[in-house]
Amino acid sequence: MQTAHIGTDIIEISRIRKAIKAHSQRILNKIFTKREQEYCLSLTNPYPSFAARFAAKEAVAKALGTGIGKVVRWKDIEILKSSKHPEVYLPERVYKELGISKVLLSISHSREYATAVAVTLI
């Protein structure tokens, strides 16, 4: 029988927008992978997608039980869009070290907030 761990996060889109405008490329490069940046910046309004990915990374880190830090860094968690649902990419070492078999993710945003729920299967 598999064990599941859940993580969730919510963030104001305006908070991400302000951070990106204040710190621009520095904050983008610290938190988001090149592919995440390319996708979000291809949109007319990239801030909801950046905020959703930020919330997703937080939710995944919580579901992993590690938070963001020594075991998992911001850019270790990559959130990419697929045709059906968001996909989570982690380094193989994270799967092995934490005994994770799969990560499931749901993300959403409204006009003001972005939210994410992640489930890790062990």
From Swiss-Prot:
Name the catalysed reactions: apo-[ACP] + CoA = holo-[ACP] + adenosine 3',5'-bisphosphate + H(+)
Q: Which InterPro entries match?
A: 4-PPantetheinyl_Trfase_dom (IPR008278), 4-PPantetheinyl_Trfase_dom_sf (IPR037143), ACPS (IPR002582), Ppantetheine-prot_Trfase_dom (IPR004568)
Provide the E.C. number(s) assigned to this enzyme: 2.7.8.7
- Identify the keywords attached in UniProt to this record, alphabetized: Cytoplasm, Fatty acid biosynthesis, Fatty acid metabolism, Lipid biosynthesis, Lipid metabolism, Magnesium, Metal-binding, Transferase
What's an example GO cellular component term for this entry?
cytoplasm
Sorted alphabetically, the Gene Ontology BP terms of this entry are: fatty acid biosynthetic process
* Annotated compartments: Cytoplasm
Top-level taxon in the UniProt lineage? Bacteria
Cofactors demanded by this protein: Mg(2+)
Q: What does this protein do?
A: Transfers the 4'-phosphopantetheine moiety from coenzyme A to a Ser of acyl-carrier-protein.
Name used for this protein in its record: Holo-[acyl-carrier-protein] synthase
